């Protein structure tokens, strides 16, 4: 099976793409990541994918024209059903739009925050990156509240800051690639999630996640620096860190990885064998 995905820099499509790449042998698939600027007809004609992932703005009459001579299925990331003759085999939508798909419930999935296991699995402890606390500003826009928290953290704890947004603090060490990010998380005792769902990657690496304005009861959540201080002092002193890390790690490997999302996708399009293959790959990684 040939599967094509656009190279859009959205965390969800990046996570799906990364995990699918690791499933090429397990699930007998070929994965192609195409430049989103390239005309859709060219992609369909050159690659001839069996399955293609498209965002709503990419799904247009080209699909109807291509379907006259090419045999393919597509999955649409969309906020509403598409008005095309060539219908998607499945939809993926955000929770806020799910009521728009009331007539498509059987083939509609919701976007769910997930750990990008394929990118972070090999994270290693690094002497250079060791810290009590790590913070990453990927996939969020830093505001006054975030900066206030970061300034407080850097005066109270051995903190290292990373990410594409430059921060005028000596503790800011710059942006990281996917491997450096995994190592930096693994080399800290605690990592702060400022609202970008990094808590799931953190939990998978068995590091303690602490989440700004989090709502999941299993995770350590805070809304103020005072609440954060109490949480950090307990975790740094190891009063509950090991038990906490084990519980959130189990939560992630039970249902919160992109391998689970891919299993759901294959299941909804009627491919139970590849669905199970995705879960088997996760089990293989976890057992290493």
PLM feature spans:
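Catalytic binding pocket for nucleotide-activated donors in carbohydrate/polymer assembly enzymes
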Residues: 3-33, 85, 161-273, 277-286
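Catalytic core of nucleotide-activated saccharide and alditol-phosphate transferases
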Residues: 58-156, 256-257
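A short, glycine/small-residue-rich beta-strand->loop->alpha-helix junction that serves as a flexible
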Residues: 7-15, 54, 140-144
């Amino acid at each position: 099976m040939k599967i094509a995905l656009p190279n859009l820099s959205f965390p969800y499509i990046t996570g799906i793409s990364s995990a699918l790449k690791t499933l090429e042998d397990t699930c007998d698939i070929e994965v192609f990541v195409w430049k989103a600027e390239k005309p859709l007809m060219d992609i369909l004609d050159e690659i001839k994918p069996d399955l293609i992932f498209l965002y709503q703005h990419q799904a247009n009459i080209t699909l109807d024209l291509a379907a006259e001579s090419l045999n393919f299925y597509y999955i649409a990331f969309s906020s509403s059903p598409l008005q095309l003759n060539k219908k998607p085999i499945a939809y993926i939508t955000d929770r806020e739009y799910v009521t728009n798909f009331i007539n498509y419930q059987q083939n509609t999935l919701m976007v769910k925050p997930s750990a990008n296991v394929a990118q972070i699995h090999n994270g290693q402890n690094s002497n250079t990156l060791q810290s009590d606390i790590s913070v990453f500003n990927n996939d969020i826009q830093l505001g006054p509240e975030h900066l206030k928290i970061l300034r407080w953290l850097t005066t109270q704890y051995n903190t290292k800051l990373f990410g594409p947004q430059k921060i005028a603090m000596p503790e800011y060490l710059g942006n990281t690639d996917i491997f450096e990010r995994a190592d930096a998380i693994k080399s800290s005792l605690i990592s702060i999630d400022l609202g970008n769902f990094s808590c799931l990657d953190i939990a998978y690496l068995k590091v303690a996640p602490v989440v700004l304005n989090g709502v999941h009861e299993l995770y350590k959540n805070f809304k103020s620096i005072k609440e954060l201080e109490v949480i950090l002092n307990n975790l740094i002193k190891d009063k509950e860190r090991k038990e906490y890390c084990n519980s959130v790690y189990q939560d992630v490997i039970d249902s919160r990885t992109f391998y689970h999302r891919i299993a759901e996708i294959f299941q909804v399009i009627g491919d139970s064998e590849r669905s199970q293959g995705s879960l088997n790959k996760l089990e293989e990684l976890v057992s290493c």
